[in-house]
Curated annotation (Swiss-Prot):
Organism: Methanocella arvoryzae (strain DSM 22066 / NBRC 105507 / MRE50)
Protein name: A-type ATP synthase subunit F
UniProt GO BP: proton motive force-driven plasma membrane ATP synthesis
Membrane topology listed for this record: Peripheral membrane protein
Superkingdom, taxonomy of origin: Archaea
Keywords: ATP synthesis, Cell membrane, Hydrogen ion transport, Ion transport, Membrane, Transport
GO MF annotations in UniProt: ATP binding; proton-transporting ATP synthase activity, rotational mechanism; proton-transporting ATPase activity, rotational mechanism
């Protein structure tokens, strides 16, 4: 399984420098949704990283798909902490790491 990062260039550049090969730069909200949907169909991806601010710019239907997706698992990082990360990890691996 691979990790992918989707977002604006200033967000993905650090991941690229850290060795993540599947980084996708998007220029607008339409490109963001399109790239997320493309990543959902890639069977080699296990984790997809997004900036938490970008989640505000996608449609409610796609947000629901992201929230319910176990494989690939979506992780939103950035300006605010993702309270659902604990639940996503628990669903993905079946263990609560915080206990």
């Amino acid at each position: 399984m691979e990790i992918a990062v989707v977002g604006k260039s200033e967000f993905v550049v650090g991941f690229r420098l850290a060795g993540i090969h599947k980084t996708y730069e998007v220029k607008n909200d339409k490109d963001l949704e399109s790239k997320i949907r493309e990543c959902l169909t890639d069977r080699n991806l296990g984790i997809i990283v997004l900036h938490s601010d970008d989640l505000k710019h996608i449609s409610p239907g796609l947000q629901k798909v992201i929230d319910e997706s176990v494989e690939p698992t979506f992780i939103a990082i950035g300006s605010k902490e993702d309270a659902g990360l604990r639940d996503k990890i628990k669903r993905a691996i079946g263990v609560d790491l915080w206990k």
